[in-house]
From Swiss-Prot:
Role summary: Participates in the formation of new permeability pathways in Plasmodium-infected erythrocytes enabling the uptake of nutrients from the blood plasma. Required for maintaining invasion capacity of merozoites. Required for parasite growth and proliferation.
Stated name of the protein: High molecular weight rhoptry protein 2
Gene Ontology CC annotation, any one: symbiont-containing vacuole membrane
Keywords, ordered alphabetically: Cytoplasm, Cytoplasmic vesicle, Disulfide bond, Host cell membrane, Host cytoplasm, Host membrane, Membrane, Signal, Transmembrane, Transmembrane helix, Transport
Transmembrane region(s): 716-736
Disulfide bonds: C50-C75, C220-C227, C768-C828, C848-C889, C924-C1011
The gene coding this protein: RhopH2
């Protein structure tokens, strides 16, 4: 027999990875475990090494001689294998971690002694490592084990990148520097514009010559999108000016009546913009007058528009109608020429010029041939007007036209219907090749080595090659505009460039800048696209998928989308530039706290998608790359309650530290693109996939060069990357718009009962491979070559994919609102295209002898999927429990005999009870499948309607007491019904009789066993619904369930028992404890009585019609609830009385009051322990409500049963370890408990209460700080005020001086007074948490107020 001791508790412990508390179980020993492990030294003899291992596991005096003999044989063989293997370090590391993991689960000892003993065991196994190497290895083994146990605060990785967090000095400096530089760069704007004026006014010292070269200045490189707008306007002006000069020259050269007209003056209004109109005398006759033009105030009218000198009242009246003295006029060419014959000649000469220019393009030539004299005149009038004023002539819908619609851009020309002018510009300045289809094809470098040789400068942060600074700057200038110097020589000194500069930069917004990093990446991405074709897809491949006959349709789709959404696209581009800055900050983050220098097979994320900096040594791994990406993503999603003004693109000097969700911005554009492609919504995704070349062609035009002159605008490489990935995800990866029946399983996150359909996971695997392959931007990568821009795009891709999946600011894996499809697909992408199940299975096969538990190739997938499903399909938890499983499996192989989990009987039950949690969970689900089949057979046997709630209770109770799989469940069920107590006693006696463990230990194992399906109302309901769904739909099911659901609460209330016990001092009875959550329950009963009486009164009185009564009752009910919370939450009925203690009906939350922001900052009591009665406990367990102290929905694991020091616990009860446990306590099982504080309040905890020493946040994160939990922490006075219920309370985050949140360093425990009355006599470990849970009182209050307002409005 194995004696009662710690070795049994090696496997008794459930490492509660789905819980917020890290709790370990142990048996108390007479001898201090530290005394034994101090004997462990470096040994050569393998027998002595194995003895040391037994001592380290605290099992040396536990095993029988037979057990010990078997263990020693297996242990010595393993040591031989380790010493003879070539990859000894890998095996040694994993075995050492297995030992550390098993020891930490049941023994509480000094970390210093653990380190020394483990170091000596490792040296005994592998002497090739030096002393410093072994010490470092031990440190990382212990860190990894802490992570598995939930003690490592790795979530701080997520905080290190968020601008509001003050941790990590280096990151704080980097963030400050980023913000400081953004502000500094915005000040450059003040060098060009008068910031004090009401509107953006260009300073007088800015000459046109200097503005033309702005591309070389900081302003242009900081606001790339605005700079491109400026150069686009100047380029268009230059081209139109050139065309007009050619027309004038051609007319002069071909007009016979030379000297009759000054052709130059004929095609001109004035030589200067700012002067008195010479046409005022014609205003009311034949001269065209445009006065009703709605123009922006960003420019001064007298610098652009003619000033009219009125000559009589009529003109003055006309000016008054024009809303001012400044108007614009249009040249009347026909009147200016005078002679109709001369007019015809001049128009014909101009037409011949147009014919000559367009002769190689048949379509345009045909259009020119059809032009009459009036059409030619209108064309020339518009040219003359534009060259004179600098903006376009628009004569229609003048009330809706703003100056920004009249500036010379390609899209404005198209909107103004200047089609002929655009064609001429295209022909003269683009290319002689009129085949647009061919122009989209371009050559790229196919020589990988040559490609990387051009990226020849090493980036100081990532240590990856990037484009050299000179090449990048030259290419940036080229992108801006190639005609800049030509324009300067052509129009030297003209002030229209000042106007264009003003119009481009008037909307300068500090939140839409490009930092030097973003600018370099922006240039580098365009450079690699133009020269190498680096993108998600090959541009030439897209063009080859478009037929020439269909090409025009693609151009039109692209044109319509860009014309409609250009400003939104520019905005998206600027916001992604800030995202690139956040990625840059992530590279700067100090990752030393989050790496493991190990060669284990159980990494949390695979090498392929790791930060490149860790690729230099594949043994160095970041604990959680996912957290780094998630922290960046959270800067764009629900970062704070304050909403960012999305699409606010006008001038702003206010800097926001939170940003819009870039995925949402891109998704809106995706919808616009899908609609533009004229795709119906049924089923949308499939058609999107089939027509994707429309979208990709459009995106190619965004990157540029856009050969469609009608929609040409700024090059937007960042927006193109984001929109392309979003389009691919939404069209080929996302399943949300599929019909429910198509992917029903994947959209839910229910635990598995029946084995899964492999087709569902094959779809997931296929789409994961598609997405993983798609996000590679360089398909012909040379071996071992990697560039900076590839690394940034990789991280951008991962952030984008995370934003697609996120439903809140919670970690996506821990958010129950996220479907299993998204969780598993995102995990698969982070693993480089390997599903989390595949990775776990590979790890198990490599590290564990599966036959130990009856697992094999045929059932390992089901085994893993079941365990994954019970944890809400959380890949993070699966990898943790799988790692714990393989570590436990190694030791179990040496200690216990094998068994088959599919055939557990009374003889093997004790093996199941000490097996890893994954095995127990799988066995539970095998029981659940038997329960499902039994339910189906009983429902069918009783013809549905005869199946009553009593039958349901019988089925539940049968499986609640059953511990083993039955060969014939129906037969055993019938035996159970004959005598339930006798059946349970017989099964228990048989299990104890066959167990090779101590009888008391076996009894504890029997009592503590629980199965997922039978431990809560919700879980059993899921099983039941699954069984019923197998029988088909119908009214009988509705009738059947109506009775079941009405009685389920009674059924499960008596089954929910809190198993953990915490001792308190006897003086607890004398206090006036308040049940904080009692009003949630009592208000319901109170208000139902009130409204019932009101209903009877209203019905009898007849004062209200039958139609009015329901709304009146609802309104009174909601008002009653709200009033109760406000006025009655401190009533005596909510207090806890001495009789509740005497009847053992008092419970306490493990976690103290969590929402400390609700407590007034003058209140000395900032640490509050919440006690509740049994009635409130049952309500919280049954109701679907988010309780902060439970960090979500409550389970029995979140509570301790209160026991006074005068009472005695039962032998099988688990005791929370503290100094109040009586010496004569019958139970020997202990648990350690951890207390959490939200990270927002950690800054208040800076001093050791006992010694005054400085306490750092890092000390808390390392588990080196304890918190005092004395009697002054008990909740005895209400903290909620009226402000909490009318939603006006302002959260506080600072504690007053001398508050009761007392903390001390663990090393100072011996300084605590040996007095049970001391406030620190009871203390627990403190840790930091980032989880945000809504206040239930606030949420309910908000809902009640909303409902009352809605009803009153009716």
């Amino acid at each position: 027999m194995v004696k009662l001791s710690g070795i049994i508790l090696l496997s008794l412990v459930w490492l509660k990875l789905n819980n917020s508390y890290e709790i370990r179980e142990r048996i108390s020993n007479k001898n201090n475990p530290d005394d034994d492990i101090l004997k462990i030294n470096v040994e050569e003899d393998k027998k002595k090494i194995c003895n040391n291992i037994l001592i380290f596991l605290n099992a040396d005096d536990i095993l029988t001689e037979n057990n010990k003999y078997s263990f020693m044989g297996k242990c010595e063989k393993l040591i031989d294998d380790i010493k003879n293997e070539n990859n000894s370090p890998d095996i040694t590391n994993e075995f050492a971690l297995s030992l550390m993991h098993m020891r930490s689960k049941h023994t509480i000892t000094s970390s210093i002694n653990n380190n020394k003993a483990l170091k000596n065991i490792i040296i005994s196994l592998d002497k090739s490592m030096s002393e410093p190497e072994v010490i470092n290895r031990v440190k990382h083994i212990i860190r990894f084990n802490k992570y598995l146990a939930g003690k490592l605060s790795y979530k701080n990785i997520g905080e290190s990148l968020v601008l509001r967090v003050s941790s990590h000095e280096r990151m704080r400096r980097s963030k400050r520097e980023l913000v400081r530089n953004i502000l500094k760069d915005f000040h450059i704007y003040g060098l060009y514009f008068d910031l004090k004026s009401e509107n953006s006014t260009l300073l007088k010292n800015q000459e046109s010559e200097s503005l033309i070269n702005i591309k070389n200045e900081k302003l242009c490189q900081t606001y790339i999108h605005l700079c491109q707008k400026f150069y686009e306007q100047t380029s268009v002006y230059y081209k139109i000016k050139t065309i007009l000069n050619e027309v004038i020259k051609h007319t002069k050269d071909n007009y016979a009546l030379e000297g009759e007209y000054d052709i130059s003056k004929l095609f001109s209004l004035e030589n200067s913009i700012s002067q008195v109109s010479q046409h005022s005398d014609h205003m009311l006759t034949n001269e065209s007058l445009i006065y009703d033009m709605n123009k922006s105030n960003y420019i001064k009218y007298n610098q652009l528009i003619h000033e009219v000198i009125p000559e009589d009242g009529n003109i003055e009246e006309q000016v008054k109608k024009g809303n001012g003295r400044y108007i614009v006029v249009v040249k009347n060419l026909k009147k200016a020429i005078g002679n109709s014959e001369n007019y015809d000649n001049i128009m014909n000469i101009i037409k011949k010029y147009l014919i000559n220019v367009t002769k190689n393009n048949k379509e345009i030539l045909d259009m020119v041939m059809e032009l009459g004299n009036e059409d030619i005149e209108q064309f020339m009038t518009q040219l003359v007007f534009f060259i004179h004023y600098g903006f376009l002539l628009i004569t229609e819908d003048k009330h809706m036209i703003y100056l920004s619609d009249m500036i010379p851009t390609y899209t404005n020309l198209y909107r103004a219907n200047e089609v002929l002018l655009l064609h001429i510009m295209d022909i003269k300045f683009e290319s002689d090749d009129f085949n647009k289809y061919e122009k989209y094809k371009f050559e790229t470098s196919d020589n990988d080595k040559e490609t990387y040789s051009l990226l020849n400068e090493i980036d100081s942060i990532t240590q990856l090659p990037k484009l050299s600074e000179n090449v990048a700057n030259d290419y940036f200038s080229k992108i801006m505009d190639k005609d800049a110097y030509t324009m300067l020589t052509l129009d030297k000194g003209i002030n229209k460039y000042q106007f264009y500069f003003t119009m481009a930069f008037k909307d300068c917004n500090i939140n839409q800048n490009y930092t030097p990093l973003a600018k370099d990446l922006w240039t580098e991405l365009i450079y690699t696209f133009d020269n190498f074709g680096w993108f998600y897809f090959n541009p030439n491949k897209i063009m080859s998928s478009i037929s020439k006959s269909n090409f025009i349709r693609h151009v039109l789709v692209s044109r319509n989308f860009i014309l409609k959404n250009m400003e939104s696209l520019i905005y998206l581009d600027t916001q992604i530039s800030r995202l690139m800055d956040m990625i840059g900050l992530s590279f700067l983050a100090d990752k030393s706290e989050y790496i493991l220098d190990l060669s284990l097979s159980n990494y949390l994320f695979l090498y392929v998608n790791e930060y490149h900096i860790f690729k230099k040594d594949e043994n160095v791994k970041l604990i959680h790359t996912y957290d780094y990406i998630d922290s960046i993503a959270n800067n764009y999603y629900y970062f704070s309650e304050k909403k960012y003004p999305v699409f606010k693109t006008d001038y702003s000097s206010k800097l926001y530290t939170n940003f819009p969700n870039v995925y949402s911005l891109a998704y809106q554009l995706f919808n616009e693109l899908a609609i533009n492609m004229n795709i119906s919504n049924t089923p949308l995704k499939k058609k999107l996939k089939n027509k994707s070349n429309y979208a990709y062609f459009t995106i190619l035009n965004l990157i540029g060069p856009n050969h469609d002159i009608y929609s040409r605008g700024p090059r937007l490489i960042f927006a193109a990357y984001m929109l392309t990935l979003v389009f691919f995800i939404e069209s080929q990866i996302d399943i949300s718009r599929y019909r429910p029946n198509d992917m029903y399983f994947m959209k839910k996150a229910m635990p598995l009962l029946a084995p899964i359909n492999r087709d569902d996971f094959n779809i997931l695997k296929k789409r994961c491979s598609l997405l993983t392959d798609f996000i590679k931007i360089n398909r012909n990568k040379a071996k071992n070559e990697h560039s900076r821009v590839e690394e940034y795009i990789k991280i951008l891709n991962l952030v984008t994919i995370l934003l697609w999946g996120k439903e809140s600011n919670k970690s996506l894996y821990y958010d129950n609102d996220v479907s299993l499809y998204k969780k598993l697909l995102i995990a698969c992408v982070f693993n480089g295209g390997i599903t989390v199940q595949e990775k776990v299975i590979k790890s198990i096969k490599r590290s564990c002898n599966m036959e130990q538990y009856g697992l094999n190739k045929s059932n390992i997938e089901d085994f893993v999927n079941v365990n994954l499903s019970v944890y809400q399909w959380n890949p993070d938890i699966l990898e943790k429990i799988a790692t714990a499983f393989t570590l436990t499996c190694k030791v179990h192989n040496m200690i216990y005999e094998p068994f088959d989990v599919h055939k557990v009987d009374a003889k093997d039950y004790y093996k199941l009870a000490v097996a890893p949690d994954m095995v127990k969970t799988y066995h539970c689900f095998l029981l659940g499948r038997q329960a499902e089949r039994l339910l189906e057979s009983l429902i069918l046997k009783k013809n549905f309607v005869k199946f009553k709630v009593e039958d349901a209770i019988d089925v539940y109770e049968f499986f609640y007491v059953t511990r083993i799989l039955s060969k014939n469940p129906r037969e055993d069920f019938e035996l159970f019904l004959k005598n339930k107590k006798e059946y349970q006693k017989k099964q228990k006696d048989e299990i104890i009789k066959n167990s090779k463990l101590d009888e008391n230990v076996t009894d504890i194992l029997f009592q503590n066993y629980e199965c997922y399906w039978f431990k809560s109302y919700e879980n059993f309901k899921s099983l039941w619904m699954h069984a019923a769904s197998n029988l088909g739909p119908g009214a009988y099911l509705r009738n059947f369930f109506s009775e079941i659901w009405n009685n389920m609460g009674t059924l499960f209330k008596k089954q929910s028992k809190v198993r953990d016990v915490e001792y308190f001092n006897i003086n607890l009875i004398g206090g006036t404890l308040i049940d904080y959550y009692s009003p949630l329950l009592k208000s319901e009963e109170h208000c139902r009585n009130v409204t019932q009486k009101l209903f009877i009164s209203m019905k009898d009185s007849g004062t209200k019609s039958r139609i009015e009564i329901p709304d009146e009752i609802k309104s009174k009910y909601f008002q009653c609830k709200l009033d109760y919370y406000k006025n009655n939450h401190s009533d005596p009925v909510h207090k806890i009385y001495s009789r509740d203690f005497l009847e053992n009906k008092v419970y306490v939350f493990k976690q103290p009051y969590y929402l400390l922001s609700n407590i007034d900052d003058k209140n000395k009591k900032q640490l509050l322990r919440l006690f509740i009665t049994e009635t409130t406990l049952q309500y919280l367990l049954l109701d679907d409500i988010q309780i902060p102290e439970c960090l979500g929905r409550c389970t029995i694991e979140h509570f301790n049963k209160v026991l006074l020091t005068t009472a005695n616990a039962k032998p099988h009860e688990t005791i929370i370890y503290n100094g109040l446990i009586p010496e004569n306590c019958k139970s020997k099982i202990r648990k350690e408990m951890k207390i959490f504080i939200h990270s927002s309040f950690v800054h208040n905890l800076t001093r050791d209460y006992l010694t005054g020493e400085l306490i750092r946040t890092q000390d808390i994160q390392n588990g080196d700080v304890h918190v005092c939990m004395g009697s002054d922490t008990y909740y005895t006075e209400n903290i909620l005020t009226d402000q909490h219920f009318d939603l006006t309370h302002k959260p506080q985050f600072n504690f007053p001086e001398n508050n009761n949140y007392r903390v001390f360093l663990k090393k100072n425990i011996n300084k605590i007074a040996k007095n049970p009355e001391s406030q620190c006599y009871v203390h627990y470990e403190l840790s930091v948490l980032d989880t945000d849970i809504p206040d239930p009182y606030r949420e309910i209050g908000k809902d009640l107020i909303t409902n009352i307002e809605l009803l009153e409005s009716k």
